[in-house]
Amino acid sequence: MSQKITLIKDKVLSDNYFILRNITYDLTRKNGDVIRHKREVYDRGNGATILLYNREKQTVVLIRQFRVATWVNGNESGQLIETCAGLLDNDEPEACIRKEAIEETGYEVGEVRKLFELYMSPGGVTELIHFFIAEYSDSQRANAGGGVEDEDIEVLELPLTQALAMIKTGEIRDGKTVLLLNYLHSSSLIY
């Protein structure tokens, strides 16, 4: 017998920017026992992220920006080094990531490769992230990047070896970025 879920209550607690829900549900276990759970679920929509790499220069493009949640959780500056990313809104994942790459990094990418889709914090956040990689060259630089009006993004071009070392030193602490850097390192794309 598989588990059965019965929704008891779905109450919206906040919809200021994203949606915070209080969900009450009954979970029928495989043995037939029913357990009632009450959980808060944060629905911020789905997203996409991309790691840009240059095979010839052995480099990657990352960004640094303020992330309030890291600041609240003890990151003194709130600055986080990460891959380019954005919420899908009404876009398809590939269209979203192409738009975000131009806005955040300044690079207009050519061929992109989708790797996988992952839930990053499924205990309380609904977001499913689509992961991409793409090769870039200096000739694809369309602008300086830096994000849109309400963003303050620094574009970083780093040797892959340095970016990997920054994971070990704790300078890179973003999950999606660590996954993509390690994927690139373990593939034959850049070495």
Swiss-Prot record:
Molecular-function GO term, any one: metal ion binding
E.C. code: 3.6.1.-
Top-level EC class: hydrolase
InterPro entries with a match to the protein in the record: NDP_pyrophosphatase, NUDIX_hydrolase-like_dom_sf, NUDIX_hydrolase_dom
BP GO terms, sorted: nucleoside phosphate metabolic process; ribose phosphate metabolic process
Keyword set includes Metal-binding: yes
NCBIfam families cross-referenced by the UniProt entry: nudix-type nucleoside diphosphatase, YffH/AdpP family (TIGR00052), PRK15009.1 (NF011585)
Function: Nucleoside diphosphate sugar hydrolase that hydrolyzes GDP-mannose as its preferred substrate, yielding GMP and mannose-1-phosphate.
Family designation: Belongs to the Nudix hydrolase family. NudK subfamily.
Assembly mode: Homodimer.
Name this polypeptide is given: GDP-mannose pyrophosphatase
Gene: nudK
